[in-house]
């Protein structure tokens, strides 16, 4: 997720954003609909809104 290139440095923002990244990784890891690696799942979620909606609906966050 390119954490090294991230420019978030104000207050607790870096820690909060790290937590959000961790949640996103857990959601994609637990997805069983699309059998692929984490990087491919991230790309598919970024490009396909239907897949993103199904991942969020499956995690209970939508």
From Swiss-Prot:
InterPro entries: Transposase_11-like
Protein name, entry field: Putative uncharacterized protein YafF
Highest classification ranks of the organism: Bacteria, Pseudomonadati, Pseudomonadota, Gammaproteobacteria, Enterobacterales
């Amino acid at each position: 997720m390119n954490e090294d290139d991230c420019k978030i440095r104000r207050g607790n923002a870096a820690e909060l954003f790290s937590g959000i990244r961790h949640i996103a990784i857990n959601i994609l890891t637990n997805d069983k609909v699309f059998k692929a690696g984490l990087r491919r799942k991230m790309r598919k979620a970024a490009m396909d809104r239907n897949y993103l909606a199904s991942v969020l609906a499956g995690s209970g966050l939508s």
